Amino acid sequence: MCCLFLRLRDYSTAHALSLPPCQRCGLQPWSARSHARRTLGVRKAGEMLRQEAASLSSSPRWTPSRRDAPCGRTLASASRPSTEGAMADRSSSSSSSPAPASAPGSSFGNKRSYAIHRAASSFPVGTSSSSARDTTYPHTFRTPLSAGNPQRSGHKSWTPQVGYSATSSAVSAHAPSVIVAVVEGRGLARGEIGMASIDLKSPQIMLSQFADNTTYAKVITKLQVLSPLEIIMSNTACVVGNSTKLFTLITENFKNVNFTTVQRKYFNETKGLEYIEQLCIAEFSSVLMEVQSRYYCLAAAAALLKYVEFIQNSVYAPKSLKIYFQGSEQTAMIDSSSAQNLELLVNNQDYRSNHTLFGVLNYTKTAGGSRRLRSNILEPLVDVETISMRLDCVQELLQDEELFFGLQSVISRFLDTEQLLSVLVQIPKQDTVNAAESKITNLIYLKHTLELVEPLKVTLKNCSTPLLRAYYGSLEDHRFGLILDKIKTVINDDARYMKGCLNMRTQKCYAVRSNISEFLDIARRTYTEIVDDIAGMIAQLAEKYSLPLRTSFSSSRGFFIQMTTDCAALSSDQLPSEFIKISKVKNSYSFTSADLIKMNERCQESLREIYHMTYMIVCKLLSEIYEHIHCLYKLSDTVSMLDMLLSFAHACTLSDYVRPEFTDTLAIKQGWHPILEKISAEKPVANNTYITEGSNVLIITGPNMSGKSTYLKQIALCQIMAQIGSYVPAEYASFRIAAQIFTRISTDDDIETNSSTFMKEMKEIAYILHNANDKSLILIDELGRGTNTEEGIGISYAVCEHLLSIKAFTLFTTHFLELCHLDALYLNVENMHFEVQHVKNTSRNKDAILYTYKLSRGLTEEKNYGLKAAEASSLPSSIVLDARDITTQITRQILQNQRSSPEMDRQRAVYHLATRLVQAARNSQLEPDRLRTYLSNLKKKYAGDFPRAVGLPEKTEE
């Protein structure tokens, strides 16, 4: 077999090693056993090869004639390669062995394999494209769809091809992987938005179409929830100097997202409908009725699928995608600014997920569960019946410990089912080693996943709540067993997901049962022999040099030699000269040799051949599975939802949360801040909240640091927790469903957009006023602090009156006590304040402020609490005294409505003139003539200001 293996790859005798080679096979006789096995007749193997090639080339790629594969066949008589010693090191190494050169145009580095591959590849594809993209690193390229677009020369895009990698670090479940196509109607249809999105980790397409206003708030919020990797728009919307307002707003709000423009003709609603009819699985075909007349989302779907097929270099198998329509009315809207203010996903200190609402609730065990939790937090439910069903599940999980721990045990063993499906339903346009390895790996993962269906069903058998019973019913689908049986006729029973790159490599090599392909069995025996030879060679080197050498393996280096010793006593210079690529880590040396590098090359060639033949068998198997694969979408949905509900129940066990009710009133008894509870050593102070339609605006006053902002965030977080189906931190809680949640809390300047604090306030308030309605929850913190007192009071007063008129539930914190008089004009206004206490500080002989963080009725009785806070700080006492005197004088002036005297105006005019002269003397870089003109204008301005200051008539120039 060894001779046949080398002959197929056109190896020459130059591959022979330094020791006397076998005259027949050209390899070193590392062991008499392996040497004897290489005497297999070339004639018989050659005949087998011709038969295999004829069989493969006569069958279409995805519709092969079925090969009878009876169950119960065992592995080939040749044992799997021994991995003892090679398992010691699974870490990746920075250095890598040179890969063998592949034949020109060959996908598998083998002319023979390439010929078989070309003969078998007959699946029609929709678009032509370049060679397959690498699955790990992004490439910059120009797409054919965007040809002719002058402002776009390329983009970078990341496309995952495998569900999991046992040889690399795990990718975050929330790494951007969504591509979105957006199109807007023209003419009278302007404002009608069509969207289509697909997650490259999940084979699901979401379609949306809705009417938006001129602020495009719904579009921006929807994109924020999707967190896209790339956005596709028509090139007519992005013309330089004449781009649409929608394109401008999207680019301003998503600066770090890649944009691709494609020709308008690809936004074709007829083609979009054809795509959906071709790709949508039967169980979700009702979407056709929903979108038949929604032309803009169909157009977006056409452009999206055409583009994804190109960048993925693959097409989706017919009837393999879950396609669904989601309207904008099915979930609550939380804009991106509010999500940031409330710290829903990332905190405002280090921008990580800890100390956020997501961090409080995230005890999920799967990537799908984590993604579902994230999307639910950003888009809470508005349907009370659905929320109540979730709450029933959480309640049963809390009451039944056996169910809780049983589900947790089973769910934690599931892999990322959505990403697994995404890879399985894609058909590569060009077969590569990566594509073959990915399909084999994910078929093993699919087997692992299906084997967990029965344990999950057993755990749910005795559940009583409707939702859990529904999930149990979905698991009784006979197709799970049917798919698993088909897989087991081809895949070994002991082929399973394992940690460690060498473990997983072995699983892939021996995934297919023996006797299904005789040529595959021969190739695997060859691989076994090569691995045994490597182990034997290293054992001989250890004996030859009397060193404690052992075989190790990493994904980057392949097999290499490792030695644990006292590196101080034995330097690298003292190692034998044939050891090369020496690296030292602590008390361990890692190195290889020229012979071992050649053996690794042969091992890789053997793997390529095994992967290719296994891939062809897997493709035949997948063609039989595709018609039943629809049930896996239900399984994916079941697992992710159960994982999220378990996470809610887990969070409840760590704190005294209560089940919320849903009425027309927002009533919270002794509620507290969930994030603050997690990061504080002590339990936060609890407060009551009561808002109804007859009292829908709360004006909240109190000193700085008394807890006003924290209280506002607490209310919003509790509202979101209730609407996603979680228990809430309170003794009792009743909520009115909020269709939108708006906040205006941040007061930082926006340097990037050159916005001051006040301008940012006005933009955020304008956004709220344009989009709020009677189903909104609005939280406004200290509006008007960015301008002078009079204007701040006026703006705050007007905003409050508008919010009073639309009946939105509003909490408004302020330092402007004048707003508290609104309750005299409007019966639906309530005044609240945070209490503080004054404690005598004996050491400094001053009063200290004690913050109670308790909310009480009425307006605050504290006066000049800013001065008291300054006095309690390290500010010098002389400055505090001056400030108090000045405050007293200013207050008196305001009360008496006094105007400044002419003498003060004269002094101010002189002061302004002197200041400008000093600035000109210090900093001016003007030319003499321009400086002379500037000083002349300054003199004229002073001459005009001074007479007005002293009450004299102005002089006019002749």
UniProtKB/Swiss-Prot annotation:
<dbReference type="GO" id="GO:0030983">
    <property type="term" value="F:mismatched DNA binding"/>
</dbReference>
<dbReference type="GO" id="GO:0000794">
    <property type="term" value="C:condensed nuclear chromosome"/>
</dbReference>
<dbReference type="GO" id="GO:0001541">
    <property type="term" value="P:ovarian follicle development"/>
</dbReference>
<keyword id="KW-0469">Meiosis</keyword>
<keyword id="KW-0238">DNA-binding</keyword>
<feature type="compositionally biased region" description="Polar residues">
    <location>
        <begin position="124"/>
        <end position="138"/>
    </location>
</feature>
<feature type="region of interest" description="Disordered">
    <location>
        <begin position="124"/>
        <end position="161"/>
    </location>
</feature>
<dbReference type="GO" id="GO:0005654">
    <property type="term" value="C:nucleoplasm"/>
</dbReference>
<dbReference type="Pfam" id="PF00488">
    <property type="entry name" value="MutS_V"/>
</dbReference>
<dbReference type="GO" id="GO:0006298">
    <property type="term" value="P:mismatch repair"/>
</dbReference>
<dbReference type="Pfam" id="PF05188">
    <property type="entry name" value="MutS_II"/>
</dbReference>
<dbReference type="InterPro" id="IPR007860">
    <property type="entry name" value="DNA_mmatch_repair_MutS_con_dom"/>
</dbReference>
<dbReference type="InterPro" id="IPR036678">
    <property type="entry name" value="MutS_con_dom_sf"/>
</dbReference>
<comment type="subunit">
    <text>Heterooligomer of MSH4 and MSH5.</text>
</comment>
<dbReference type="GO" id="GO:0000795">
    <property type="term" value="C:synaptonemal complex"/>
</dbReference>
<dbReference type="GO" id="GO:0140664">
    <property type="term" value="F:ATP-dependent DNA damage sensor activity"/>
</dbReference>
<protein>
    <recommendedName>
        <fullName>MutS protein homolog 4</fullName>
    </recommendedName>
</protein>
<dbReference type="InterPro" id="IPR045076">
    <property type="entry name" value="MutS"/>
</dbReference>
<dbReference type="GO" id="GO:0000793">
    <property type="term" value="C:condensed chromosome"/>
</dbReference>
<dbReference type="GO" id="GO:0007292">
    <property type="term" value="P:female gamete generation"/>
</dbReference>
<dbReference type="InterPro" id="IPR027417">
    <property type="entry name" value="P-loop_NTPase"/>
</dbReference>
<dbReference type="GO" id="GO:0005524">
    <property type="term" value="F:ATP binding"/>
</dbReference>
<dbReference type="InterPro" id="IPR000432">
    <property type="entry name" value="DNA_mismatch_repair_MutS_C"/>
</dbReference>
<feature type="binding site">
    <location>
        <begin position="702"/>
        <end position="709"/>
    </location>
    <ligand>
        <name>ATP</name>
    </ligand>
</feature>
<keyword id="KW-0547">Nucleotide-binding</keyword>
<keyword id="KW-0067">ATP-binding</keyword>
<dbReference type="GO" id="GO:0007129">
    <property type="term" value="P:homologous chromosome pairing at meiosis"/>
</dbReference>
<dbReference type="InterPro" id="IPR007696">
    <property type="entry name" value="DNA_mismatch_repair_MutS_core"/>
</dbReference>
<dbReference type="GO" id="GO:0005634">
    <property type="term" value="C:nucleus"/>
</dbReference>
<comment type="similarity">
    <text>Belongs to the DNA mismatch repair MutS family.</text>
</comment>
<dbReference type="Pfam" id="PF05192">
    <property type="entry name" value="MutS_III"/>
</dbReference>
<keyword id="KW-0158">Chromosome</keyword>
<feature type="compositionally biased region" description="Polar residues">
    <location>
        <begin position="146"/>
        <end position="161"/>
    </location>
</feature>
<dbReference type="GO" id="GO:0051321">
    <property type="term" value="P:meiotic cell cycle"/>
</dbReference>
<feature type="region of interest" description="Disordered">
    <location>
        <begin position="51"/>
        <end position="110"/>
    </location>
</feature>
<feature type="compositionally biased region" description="Low complexity">
    <location>
        <begin position="91"/>
        <end position="107"/>
    </location>
</feature>
<dbReference type="InterPro" id="IPR036187">
    <property type="entry name" value="DNA_mismatch_repair_MutS_sf"/>
</dbReference>
<dbReference type="GO" id="GO:0005713">
    <property type="term" value="C:recombination nodule"/>
</dbReference>
<dbReference type="InterPro" id="IPR007861">
    <property type="entry name" value="DNA_mismatch_repair_MutS_clamp"/>
</dbReference>
<dbReference type="GO" id="GO:0007283">
    <property type="term" value="P:spermatogenesis"/>
</dbReference>
<dbReference type="Pfam" id="PF05190">
    <property type="entry name" value="MutS_IV"/>
</dbReference>
<dbReference type="GO" id="GO:0005694">
    <property type="term" value="C:chromosome"/>
</dbReference>
